[in-house]
């Protein structure tokens, strides 16, 4: 399913509101993952999205990308404003999984 991409400035603003730090490598990877997912939400995150990001960022393997995204999400969850997180994930008591986070933010921002 092809969709309309979301503006990068809106995406990055939302990530910063959730507590993501722009100086972490995972921040850029999360932003790119969400942007790619909005362009083709039918693709599998682990089987298609991480390898596609690894091609775009050759310094990272798909495994390293998954780990960096997970770390960035967990850090933002731990240190970010809880009320912002509740807007997107009202029922969670722990950080969302990568796929859940990417899909939810992509759908909310489209």
Predicted regions and their residues:
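AAA+ P-loop NTPase domains with strong preference for DNA replication initiators
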Residues: 1-51
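Helical mechanochemical/support elements of P-loop NTPase systems and associated helical scaffolds
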Residues: 7, 26, 61, 65-68
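Conserved, well-folded catalytic cores of nucleic-acid-processing
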Residues: 14-17, 33-37, 56, 75, ...
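Short acidic, glycine/proline-enriched loop segments that cap or flank alpha-helices
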Residues: 18-21, 40-41, 56-65, 77
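C-terminal engagement/docking regions of AAA+ P-loop ATPases
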Residues: 55-59, 67-71, 78-110
């Amino acid at each position: 399913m092809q969709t309309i991409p979301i503006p990068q400035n809106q995406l990055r603003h939302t990530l910063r509101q959730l507590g993501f730090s722009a100086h972490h490598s995972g921040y850029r990877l999360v932003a790119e993952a969400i942007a790619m997912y909005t362009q083709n939400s039918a693709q599998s995150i682990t089987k298609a999205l991480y390898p596609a990001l690894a091609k775009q960022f050759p310094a990272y393997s798909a495994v390293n990308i998954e780990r960096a995204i997970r770390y960035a999400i967990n850090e933002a969850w731990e240190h970010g404003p809880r009320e912002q997180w509740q807007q997107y994930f009202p029922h969670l008591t722990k950080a969302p999984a990568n796929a859940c986070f990417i899909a939810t933010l992509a759908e909310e921002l489209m």
